[in-house]
Amino acid sequence: MKKTPLLNIALSRLIASLGHGDIVVIGDAGLPVPPGVELIDLALTHGVPDFLTTLKVLLSEMQVERHVLAEEILLKQPTPLAALEGMTAGGELGQRQLMNHEDFKVLSRQARAVIRTGECQPYCNIALIAGVTF
């Protein structure tokens, strides 16, 4: 059995297959998944699993160079934003880029996968751009 926090087979496979610059999106329950992009659906019910827990567990195995947020999160979601600020300051999320929510949905077309959570707070979405460990 694995020693790291991430136990989900599909997520472990995804992270192991990433190359530098590949995009992984973690989305709330309402984020549309573009046709042709792999969906890894973790949602069980409202709030389970939540956005931040999913992100923290994914970061236990994924090297992130930078991340993208919809600028709407800055005004509409102070609690998740505070946690993201801490992760950014700690170096876990790399550099930040902001764009409007509609552009974020366009960016998600380039993702290797969209991970759907049970999060029901709007704009709790993040695009993670894979980095390298060397």
From Swiss-Prot:
Pathway: Carbohydrate metabolism; D-ribose degradation; D-ribose 5-phosphate from beta-D-ribopyranose: step 1/2
Molecular function terms from GO: D-ribose pyranase activity; intramolecular lyase activity; monosaccharide binding
GO biological process, one term: D-ribose catabolic process
Active site: H20 (proton donor)
Keywords for this protein: Carbohydrate metabolism, Cytoplasm, Isomerase
Pfam families according to UniProt: RbsD_FucU
Main location: cytoplasm
Subcellular location field: Cytoplasm
Main function: Catalyzes the interconversion of beta-pyran and beta-furan forms of D-ribose.
UniProt family annotation: Belongs to the RbsD / FucU family. RbsD subfamily.
Name the UniProt record assigns to this protein: D-ribose pyranase
Species assigned in the record: Pseudomonas fluorescens (strain ATCC BAA-477 / NRRL B-23932 / Pf-5)
Upper lineage: Bacteria, Pseudomonadati, Pseudomonadota, Gammaproteobacteria, Pseudomonadales
Originating gene: rbsD
